[in-house]
Amino acid sequence: MTNKIKDILKTHKYLLLSFFLPVLLLEGIAIAEKIQPFGSESFLIVDALHQYLPFFADYQEKLKSMDSIFYSFHAGLGYNFLGLWAYYLASPLNLVIALVSKSMLTMILSHLYVLKIALCCFTAAFYFRKRRGKDEISIVAFGIAYGLCSYMVGYSWNIMWMEVMMMLPLILYGIDKLIKEHDGRLYCFALFISLWCNFYMSYMTCLFLILWYLLYSHKNVKEFFTNGFRFAGYSLLSGVMAAVVLLPAYLGIMQTSSAKLQFPKELWYGTFGNLFSRHFLGTTPLTMAVDDSKINLYCGILTLLMAGFYLAVREIRLIDKIRRLLLLVFLFFSFNMPVLGYVWHGFHDQYGIPNRFAFLYIFALLAMAYEGYCVLVRGKRKVSLWIYFAVILCGILIGITMKTSTVKLEMKTVYATVAAIAVYMICFALYQKKIFRKKIFTTLICFLFIVETAAMAVMGFQKNGTVDTDSYFQDTKAITEVKKEYQKNVETRMELISGRMLDESIWHTLNGMTLFGSTAQGNVVDMMDQLGFYTGVNEYLYEGATPFTNNLMSMKYQIYRPYDTKYTEFSLKESVGNVTVYKNPYRTALAYTMDDLVQTWDYEDYNPFYVQNDLATSAFDVDELFHMVKTAKPQLNDCKITSDNGDGEYVFENTSARPDNMVFTIRSTKTRQLYIHFDGSQVENTVIEKNGEQVLTGRLDSQIIYLGNVQKGDEIRIKMQLKQDNEMSGVVRLTAAELDEEVMEELAQRMQENAWKLTSAKGNHLSGTIHAQEDQMLFFSIPYDKGWTVKIDGKKVKTKALGKAFLTVKVPEGKHKVSLTYVSSGFKEGAILSVAGFVIIILIMLFSQRKKKAAVKEI
């Protein structure tokens, strides 16, 4: 056994080093940055904190409780968990979270980053070893250049992508085996794993694979077509094997806001220089950017030199150079052409993470550079003279970059790049002068290459920053106690009045309304906006509730922290640790019967108070719930109104940004519960004062705001600071309304009379009873989804969407048992396809094995 281990270490020492060296480096960075357990920091930055970590918490709870994988009520009033799992959580490596406590989750995920990046280095080194045919230091250097490139460092917080980057080298080596040995098994399994772990990034890989195959060096036309059938067949088979994930994921993503096709109109983003400068040594990795032309391209200066060397040497055929160059040029153009970028991103906008497919370009460039390196190593000493062509080419490209760049170049990156080229050139000169033997020369440049990329990785992670877990999760214990005490079933919804993270309520696995994620249903986002909640392209937050919408959504409890200053209509319940619990004064339910007139509900009005009035009237036959309060024109500073529709909508132009560009004043003529709502995309910040005292500040637009029980004579001032940008103009629409408390009491009573009584809630199955006074519509505060099956007294009934967003069914007069079961759309069909796919691949493997045995017998 010991001898076997020694043999493995001897035979694969550099391949193993390509894994363990990045692990040591990244763990060293973790220690320096005080990442848990070496401190309280975490690598979970940007959306890894606000989205992915909460989703992991929900997943962890499901794994530990063996709850249904299909559905979760811990976000968005309920959501297709399988669809979200396929997008964010499907990697088998993530199952490690089931072995640890929730308090260790941030630590485990930080070190899972380390593992996944190291595995990217390892698989790349494996690919380069297969190309070189030897286990040597160069595979470590080029493997690390892939795993620690600026793309990986900058976008490492997208932990769900890493398996796709990890599988790419294995997929490409699988294509080599498929074409040269007619064996597609490795290709099929590697692509299957990639598709399973993240279908979205794998889509980009699949586009790249088509280009890779078309530009591959085939022996002849016949081989091109015969291997093409194998390539297409195994590609399709890998998709069929992953269908149990792909089908639900695809059907889920098609319900999102971003599923709407809208091709960009621009022709170009920027210039060659803007892009190529991102190759320079010392460039700061990009973690996110609103500008879609931004990119991470750095993968080593030696890479550029060896790529130039590849183009220069005679030992490589001209046609092969043209093929490789065409691929790189096309990818490079794709970075700068909005239409091509739109296609690469699955016909979706890039939403702050530009050029996500750049890892494909980086690996293609590294593969080309490594071919050049192999020629250098195999060739005679005079072959290395072609490096001067590469240096001249790099010099020309640097010059063009400096000339054409329209963004400010950091000259230190230019100097660092030139200095790195000079250092490598000294090594080449010493080799050409026969001062260095080839072994010393290749070892030295590979060592320098490793130092270069490692230093950039250290700098990159320092620039990325970290997150202090103590400041974000200090209330977790108290909120967990609140949840245990009050969250009895899915009907008991509770929310944080404001979260430190956008999806913090999901982190605590509260039955909440908030959902910020790429799988948020577009129709639900639109409906929440119409009802007065804050929404974004792929989010709707618990910001903008009224007594009516709280009852409608069965919101029973609110959780406050000491810094929360928002008013609430709920009554104080108790304090637990550092948080305070408030309870809804009204009884609520998950579903209510509504009058059929609700089908005429006008939910598309821009005024959310009108939308709620019409819903309350049409569904429950009550009088007007909100009465509009007239507001005077705003006081203006460095701003002028160019148009006024007479109903609170103002078109403006501003000349500067001031805290009081626009000031609206409301003087209360009586005691009342007052609410406001305003839209203003050009509003930078808002301050709300009551009788001269500040009560709220921050991003307050696009949501209903409760201003409390305002007394007669009180003065409310809403100060808006406008943005100082290229536009310097926009629209502000402000509406004020008072709640009719008598109508609200009547409405709450009728809702309770029409309430569905929940009797059982297990995983993806709910059941309860309803007593309908007549044939009515049964409304569930659950997002409409075709995966729901509803039965009334055991008979399946047709489901409909109210306002395109909420689940409803027709219920006849009388008392009935109503049950709901959820299975993600596409799961059953996907499972059948996956089973069929695995049967086919097993048969292929058995046939291949039999064929090999037959060949051995003939010999």
Map each language-model feature to its residues.
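Hydrophobic alpha-helical membrane-insertion signals
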Residues: 7-79, 465-477, 481-506
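Contiguous transmembrane helix-bundle modules in multi-pass membrane proteins
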Residues: 182, 201, 322-339, 348-475, ...
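Transmembrane alpha-helical segments
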Residues: 120-128, 167-179, 207-215, 304-311, ...
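Periplasmic/ER-lumenal interhelical loops and adjacent helix-loop junctions
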Residues: 46, 50-51, 57-59, 92, ...
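Extracytoplasmic/lumenal acceptor-recognition loop(s) of multi-pass membrane glycoenzymes
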Residues: 448-468, 483-552, 586-588, 593-619, ...
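Active-site-proximal, structured, solvent-exposed surfaces of multi-pass membrane proteins
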Residues: 3, 8-9, 55, 633-859
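Active-site lumenal/periplasmic loops and adjacent helix-entry segments of GT-C-fold
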Residues: 29-132, 137-169, 193-197, 284-293
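Membrane-embedded helix bundles of polyisoprenyl
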Residues: 22-26, 113, 117-131, 136-218, ...
